[in-house]
Design a protein with these regions (language model features):
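Extracellular carbohydrate-recognition regions
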Residues: 23-57
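Short, threonine-centered small-residue motifs that mark membrane-proximal processing/anchoring sites
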Residues: 2-25, 204
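Structural beta-strand segments of beta-rich domains
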Residues: 107-109
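Surface-exposed, low-complexity/disordered Ser/Thr/Gly/Pro/Asn-rich loops and linkers
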Residues: 53-105
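Extended, low-complexity, turn-rich repeat/linker tracts enriched in Gly/Pro/Ser/Thr and Asp/Glu
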Residues: 102-105, 114-122, 194
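Terminal, low-complexity interaction segments
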Residues: 26-36, 117-118, 135-204
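Conserved Ser/Thr-centered positions that define the repeating blades of beta-propeller domains
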Residues: 126-129
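Short glycine-centered, acidic/aromatic-flanked micro-motifs in structured strand/loop junctions
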Residues: 98, 113, 187-189
Length: 204
C-alpha cells in the first residue's frame, strides 16, 4: 500500500496539495461546470471529481430537507464556479464519496466554504467508512465566514482571487479513512436559517 493522502484542497496552492514527497491527490472537485439553471429539490448530484488519481466512482452531492431548495453555481474562491444552495435546515449537508483503496495515512480532507449574511455559519464534518450506514464526527464544529463582510478583511468570492486563509477548512488525522472501499464525508449544517440564506463550497 502506498503512503499517499486524500488531499482535497485549494487547487491553486501547490503546497496545499502535496503534504509530503509521497503525497497524492486522490480526488478533487474544482467546480469546472455550472449547475443547470433553476435546479430545485431536496437532493442534487454535482458529479464525479475532475482532479486526482482515483476519480472513478466518486461523487459530490447535497441533501436538504426542504423541497424548494435551489442549487446554483455562483463564483468560487478563485474559480469560475462553486456549489451553492439555500433553504438550510439543521442536518442538511454537502457530501463527497470516494474510495481510498491503495492509500494509507496521512489522510486529509480540505475544502473552501462561505455563506451569505443570512446563510448558516455553524457546521460539523462527519465521516463514514461503511457506505453511509454509520457516521462519526471528525470535526465537531467550525464557523463559516461571510465573504466580504465588513471588518473580515475579505472580499466576496470571485473567479480571480483565492483566499485560502479565511475560507479553507482542513481536517487531518483521518486514519480510519485509509484503505477503504467506501469513504463518505458530510459537511453538515447544525443550524436552521432564513430560506434565502445561502452557503457554498469550492475546491474540495
Amino acid at each position: 500500500m502506498n503512503n499517499r493522502s486524500l488531499v482535497a484542497a485549494s487547487l491553486i496552492t501547490a503546497g496545499a496539495v502535496s503534504m509530503s514527497a509521497s503525497a497524492a491527490l486522490v480526488a478533487g472537485w474544482s467546480m469546472p461546470t455550472a449547475v443547470t439553471a433553476a435546479t430545485t429539490g431536496t437532493n442534487y448530484t454535482y458529479g464525479a471529481a475532475d482532479l486526482g488519481e482515483a476519480t472513478a466512482g466518486t461523487s459530490l452531492s447535497g441533501f436538504h430537507s426542504v423541497a424548494a431548495t435551489t442549487w446554483s453555481s455562483p463564483a468560487g474562491n478563485g474559480s469560475t464556479y462553486s456549489l451553492s444552495s439555500n433553504n438550510w435546515t439543521a442536518g442538511d449537508y454537502y457530501q463527497v464519496s470516494l474510495s481510498t483503496t491503495g492509500y494509507a495515512d496521512p489522510i486529509t480532507l480540505s475544502f473552501d466554504q462561505t455563506r451569505s449574511g443570512t446563510g448558516p455559519a455553524a457546521f460539523t464534518v462527519l465521516m463514514s467508512v461503511d457506505g453511509g450506514t454509520n457516521f462519526t464526527t471528525v470535526l465537531a464544529s467550525y464557523t463559516v465566514v461571510q465573504a466580504g463582510l465588513a471588518g473580515s478583511g475579505t472580499t466576496t468570492w470571485n473567479s480571480v482571487t483565492n483566499q485560502p486563509v479565511t475560507f479553507t477548512t482542513t481536517v487531518s488525522g483521518l486514519s480510519a479513512a485509509a484503505g477503504q472501499a467506501s469513504v463518505i464525508f458530510r459537511i453538515q449544517s447544525t443550524v436552521t436559517t432564513a430560506a434565502a440564506g445561502t452557503n457554498r463550497v469550492d475546491n474540495i
